From Swiss-Prot:
Lineage: Bacteria, Pseudomonadati, Pseudomonadota, Alphaproteobacteria, Rickettsiales
Protein name: Triosephosphate isomerase
Residue pairs linked by disulfide bridges in the UniProt entry: none
Organism of origin: Wolbachia pipientis subsp. Culex pipiens (strain wPip)
SUPFAM superfamilies, A to Z: Triosephosphate isomerase (TIM)
Subcellular location: Cytoplasm
Pfam families: TIM
């Protein structure tokens, strides 16, 4: 599997900025071997947008039901119809979601032909109390689907948007505790300044990038460092 680079735009960007961003990526695609997934707001989706083979579109959430009276929600099937291949699930910024709801969403996503990226991560209190492994193992047990292809995104809640990142040994320990649980990527304050260090972590399958993915030049610097790393291997 190619190294996975996921851009989570959250509630940022417009349709025109998304089209411009994708156009720039398409122009650079012959220099990129990594798999790129861009997750803009729903309003930016265009089902007819031209994408080169290594660029995919993802959603930032989906409901576990196919349709119904769920104001403000979107189904996995709707995302698929809009041209999505991936969907981020269980992000900590989505308040009050239970582990069982996240599991249902992941199973529905797979049934609809999407590849779920399922977030796990400890809060600052659990981190300080050295309960990271315990929390991650519990979340994996209760959030992950029983079958199908998926990716785990280890994104410690205390690291999101703070500029703080766990040391490589701590991330490697989480990956080790998830052995046999498919592919594992890291998210939480990923930037062009720390990506080189993160790339030295054994068995890391990719990265989930937030604010650093909004600026094309910054995002492309990250891609270039990933490409440099794997071209030397």
């Amino acid at each position: 599997m190619s190294f996975l680079i996921v851009a989570n735009w959250k509630m940022n960007g417009t349709r025109s900025s998304f089209v411009d961003f994708i156009g720039k990526l398409n122009n650079k695609s012959n220099e990129i071997t990594s798999k790129l997934v861009i997750c803009p707001p729903f309003t930016s989706f265009q089902s007819n947008i031209e994408l080169n083979n290594n660029i995919k579109i993802g959603g930032q959430n989906c409901h576990h039901k196919e349709f119904g009276s769920y104001t403000g929600e979107i189904s996995a099937g709707m995302l698929k119809e809009l041209g999505c291949s991936y969907v981020i699930l269980g992000h900590s910024e989505r308040a009050h979601e239970t582990d069982s709801e996240i599991k249902l969403k992941s199973e529905t996503a797979i049934e609809s032909g999407l590849h779920p990226i399922i977030c796990v991560g400890e809060n600052s209190e659990d981190y300080k109390n050295k309960k990271t492994k315990e929390v991650i193992e519990y979340q994996c047990k209760n959030r992950l689907p029983t079958q199908g292809k998926y990716t785990i995104a280890y994104e410690p809640i205390w690291a999101i948007g703070t500029g703080n990142v766990p040391n490589n040994d701590a991330i490697a320990e989480v990956i080790k505790s998830c052995t046999g649980k498919k592919h594992i990527i890291y998210g939480g304050s990923v930037s062009s300044e720390n990506i080189e260090n993160l790339l030295s972590i054994p068995n890391l399958s990719g990265v989930l990038i937030g604010s650093a993915s909004l600026d094309f030049d910054h995002f492309y610097k990250i891609i270039q460092q990933v490409e440099k790393k794997f071209s030397l291997n």
